[in-house]
Amino acid sequence: MKLAKRVSALTPSTTLAITAKAKELKAAGHDVIGLGAGEPDFNTPQHIIDAAVRSMNEGHTKYTPSGGLAELKNSIAEKFKRDQNIEYKPSQIIVCTGAKHALYTLFQVILDEEDEVIIPTPYWVSYPEQVKLAGGKPVYVEGLEENHFKISPEQLKNAITEKTKAIVINSPSNPTGVMYTEEELSALGEVCLEHDILIVSDEIYEKLTYGGKKHVSIAQLSDRLKEQTVIINGVSKSHSMTGWRIGYAAGSEDIIKAMTNLASHSTSNPTSIAQYGAIAAYNGPSEPLEEMREAFEHRLNTIYAKLIEIPGFSCVKPEGAFYLFPNAKEAAQSCGFKDVDEFVKALLEEEKVAIVPGSGFGSPENVRLSYATSLDLLEEAIERIKRFVEKHS
């Protein structure tokens, strides 16, 4: 059967391809270290699990409103006020089946054919594909490594056309882990206000920040910027709840209403049980979150120092999330590979270390390593990479 053009044009996920190959090697009995994970390696905190079990025993196993439980939307609104001093009414919030689906639904309701969305590179792999699925056109603006992968107001201005509808800002970033400062966000925001561009602020890694740095949302900088922004967030990364599939969007009532209408004809509601777990996540203790954040920071500081000692590797130190995004072009060349993608494939075949080539994130000279695994495995992986480079150089 001939498939729809919009699906046939999709680019397969580089991350999933590497993960599948790693699983294949593991199944064959090889000692594979996988650093492709996009999820915390900690279990969901117990009080959240208990709340979900309790909700089932209390009979909360039926449909909920398409936009999410009122109690959960109230908890999210309280979280915004408590953490970022932003005020949203429940009618300005929609709960979705994960932050990814919140983004998908948003693009579906704001984009018409050929509308343009500015996406800074490097980017999370699903941004351009979701834009294309909604009929839009991704427009890439390069975040240079010497600028810590962040774009400037001038770059943004130069990318704007009469078809520009939105820009995606992801801070802390997947895959780089860098964060925009308040001053940088304010400058980008002024350009967006001047040209009436919607700001899509992906804040899913908000709680995972390091070096004493605190996340800043562009929506908290002014009332005008709040009105011009849709925030995407969820409990997946902050509370180690990736499998629960609870995310949300917060923005103007007209956009949220349209997203809710679309959800009513697509997913209906997010899983009722997971929603009760998310309520417990936002109303429960913060100690498990801080313990996870501290563990990630310790891993980062330990392996970053070892990684940059590998010949041919350079790396901007992350400020958040749980990824390293080093430039490996020089290492690949010194090892005799035509590009970084070939380097990554050979590394997996020979040393059984799975990392993700940066080509899938719009940066073909880089690779992404997740430190969402044990420190022992991380240190062993770095040793294997170093051995691989020294052997081929």
UniProtKB/Swiss-Prot annotation:
Modified residues (N6-(pyridoxal phosphate)lysine): 237
InterPro entries in the record: Aminotransferase_I/II_large (IPR004839), AspAT/PAT-like (IPR050596), NHTrfase_class1_PyrdxlP-BS (IPR004838), PyrdxlP-dep_Trfase (IPR015424), PyrdxlP-dep_Trfase_major (IPR015421), PyrdxlP-dep_Trfase_small (IPR015422)
Catalytic activity: L-aspartate + 2-oxoglutarate = oxaloacetate + L-glutamate
Family: Belongs to the class-I pyridoxal-phosphate-dependent aminotransferase family.
Statement: the UniProt record of this protein carries the keyword Transmembrane: no
EC number: 2.6.1.1
Organism listed in the record: Bacillus subtilis (strain 168)
A biological process term (GO) from this entry: biosynthetic process
Binding residues for L-aspartate: 38, 124, 174
Cellular component, GO annotation: cytoplasm
Name by which UniProt lists this protein: Aspartate aminotransferase
Cofactor requirement: pyridoxal 5'-phosphate
Signal peptide boundaries: none
Domain of life: Bacteria
Keyword Cytoplasm tagged: yes
Subcellular location: Cytoplasm
Organism ancestry: Bacteria, Bacillati, Bacillota, Bacilli, Bacillales
Gene3D superfamilies: Aspartate Aminotransferase, domain 1 (3.90.1150.10), Type I PLP-dependent aspartate aminotransferase-like (Major domain) (3.40.640.10)
Molecular function as annotated in GO: L-aspartate:2-oxoglutarate aminotransferase activity; pyridoxal phosphate binding; transaminase activity
Keywords: Aminotransferase, Cytoplasm, Pyridoxal phosphate, Transferase
